[in-house]
Amino acid sequence: MELERIVSAALLAFVQTHLPEADLSGLDEVIFSYVLGVLEDLGPSGPSEENFDMEAFTEMMEAYVPGFAHIPRGTIGDMMQKLSGQLSDARNKENLQPQSSGVQGQVPISPEPLQRPEMLKEETRSSAAAAADTQDEATGAEEELLPGVDVLLEVFPTCSVEQAQWVLAKARGDLEEAVQMLVEGKEEGPAAWEGPNQDLPRRLRGPQKDELKSFILQKYMMVDSAEDQKIHRPMAPKEAPKKLIRYIDNQVVSTKGERFKDVRNPEAEEMKATYINLKPARKYRFH
């Protein structure tokens, strides 16, 4: 859940930075799980031209965030590289915490030998350098914070930086709406804000594995549950009307509704005598 919250906060901040007018309602747990899965497949090395399909990733993000394809490919690659580093650091912290707690629980059998002054100086220098790097990282993280996050942290001390960024990104930078969302989530009960895995309200927390599976099936699996209850009644074929026959002067005519008819004048016998029959006469042969 911690890794998914890091991905969601970074993705929302990235989209709001490069697409201020984009609709963030399409960013849900499904796309966050997809991005987290892509980063886990890439490993700690991060994206490269060999193991990362930029076109497929851009096409997938374009379906959820219209306009994502207009962001330069280099900017997207830098964001994925940076996010991969953040996830690797978070995994290292999670792995170090159980080990440190186990070491603290053990009772030392023999006293540690005294350290030399040279080793003490080297450790002091390394600790000072590590503290300087941590301070630089904190300064860079503060520079990347969305405007208004510090106000939310002052009003809600129990709210973390990732939660404040999440809510502010969902509210599209509107501070009043973000405060209202946090208040409505906090009214559900103080138990919703206790524990490391329950920092966000119920409606802002990501679902569990079973809930995510049922959510994906419900949203993308097309199953008509009422199909067995339907009765198929096909339309009866239209029968062609019977052809009507009309007669005019004892002659069969069409049914198009003719209004006029050729009227031939009777010919005289003298005129008929002038006609020539071009058809030759039949020859009758008797065998």
UniProtKB/Swiss-Prot annotation:
The keyword Cytoplasm applies. The modification Phosphoserine is found at residue 110. Significantly up-regulated in breast tumor tissues compared with matched adjacent normal tissues (at protein level). Levels inversely correlate with ESR1 in breast cancers and are lower in low-grade tumors compared to high-grade tumors. Keywords: Cytoplasm, Nucleus, Phosphoprotein, Ubl conjugation pathway. GO terms for biological process: negative regulation of cytokine production involved in inflammatory response; negative regulation of macrophage cytokine production. It is found in: Cytoplasm; Nucleus. One of its GO terms (molecular function) is ubiquitin binding. Residues 92-141 are annotated as: Disordered. Its main location: cytoplasm. PANTHER family: CUE DOMAIN CONTAINING 2 (PTHR12493), CUE DOMAIN-CONTAINING PROTEIN 2 (PTHR12493:SF0). The CUE domain mediates interaction with PGR and ESR1. Down-regulates ESR1 protein levels through the ubiquitination-proteasome pathway, regardless of the presence of 17 beta-estradiol. Also involved in 17 beta-estradiol-induced ESR1 degradation. Controls PGR protein levels through a similar mechanism. Interacts with PGR. Interacts with ESR1 in the presence or absence of 17 beta-estradiol. Belongs to the CUEDC2 family. This is CUE domain-containing protein 2.
